[in-house]
Amino acid sequence: MFLSSRMITSVSPSTSTNSSFLLTGFSGMEQQYPWLSIPFSSIYAMVLLGNCMVLHVIWTEPSLHQPMFYFLSMLALTDLCMGLSTVYTVLGILWGIIREISLDSCIAQSYFIHGLSFMESSVLLTMAFDRYIAICNPLRYSSILTNSRIIKIGLTIIGRSFFFITPPIICLKFFNYCHFHILSHSFCLHQDLLRLACSDIRFNSYYALMLVICILLLDAILILFSYILILKSVLAVASQEERHKLFQTCISHICAVLVFYIPIISLTMVHRFGKHLSPVAHVLIGNIYILFPPLMNPIIYSVKTQQIHTRMLRLFSLKRY
């Protein structure tokens, strides 16, 4: 599929800070877009429906108004927002509605994508902390995780996720973009815009690396450390049945952590060492990074968490009758 003359003009090199950017999508597979739109539309529908159902079950069931499920609702809300932040551009390309995005819209989308990624990492860390207290210090669980403290934790997560990424995102607005305005994904990422800029991007590059280390890497280390302490506490329990029961309460969270971090590591490795891979492979990994956690988390918690599983079945049985 060839670009129109108007589109070529809009994505040509310029020093304007108000130009449009071309969203490439699955380059070279434009003829298959109508077919690709079917699975992607289904995935987005499952993301939105699954996370809304988790939120609905927790909201309407008084017995689930506990710290563990409050944190799960934060995770579901984060996943829901992640799906909403990319649905317009991803499906817009596949449906033939859009091919371009303005700089302001691109910056806003990258802000929400990266902010929500940091937020998901923070929520997963908080859920690990919740499991640590529940297993290692159960007698003080309710006194430590009070409702007021949970609200403060939630506000801290939001502030931590979106405040610290503001400086590099604001800088994107004032860069000159003198390379061809062609993005390598179906959505906007900070590193994609940096690649097109001809301004001094050292601050953004170093700052972004610092954020990855201080948030994503630090969270992963703290989650691992919390599970080392949890495992030590579980192994100290004499009864094998009790050990199994305690470990079962952590299975869902462990799966959610793997579902979040494996795509991030894969995307990082592809960007770092996958220069020989086709553009389609890069776009596919990018979409897995965006869509896999929001798709899988409702499934994981609906299957592995007994309270959610029971109420989901009850919800579907009510809808049938």
UniProtKB/Swiss-Prot annotation:
It comes from Homo sapiens. It is a multi-pass membrane protein. One of its GO terms (cellular component) is plasma membrane. InterPro entries: GPCR_Rhodpsn, GPCR_Rhodpsn_7TM, Olfact_rcpt, OR51/52/56-like. The chain crosses the membrane at residues 35-55, 64-84, 109-129, 149-169, 206-226, 247-267, 283-303. The keyword Glycoprotein applies. PROSITE patterns: G_PROTEIN_RECEP_F1_1, G_PROTEIN_RECEP_F1_2. Residues 56-63, 130-148, 227-246, 304-321 are cytoplasmic. Keywords: Cell membrane, Disulfide bond, G-protein coupled receptor, Glycoprotein, Membrane, Olfaction, Receptor, Sensory transduction, Transducer, Transmembrane, Transmembrane helix. Pfam families: 7tm_4. This is Olfactory receptor 51V1. Its main location: membrane. One of its GO terms (molecular function) is G protein-coupled receptor activity. Disulfide bonds join C106-C188. Odorant receptor. Glycans are attached at N18. Residues 1-34, 85-108, 170-205, 268-282 are extracellular.
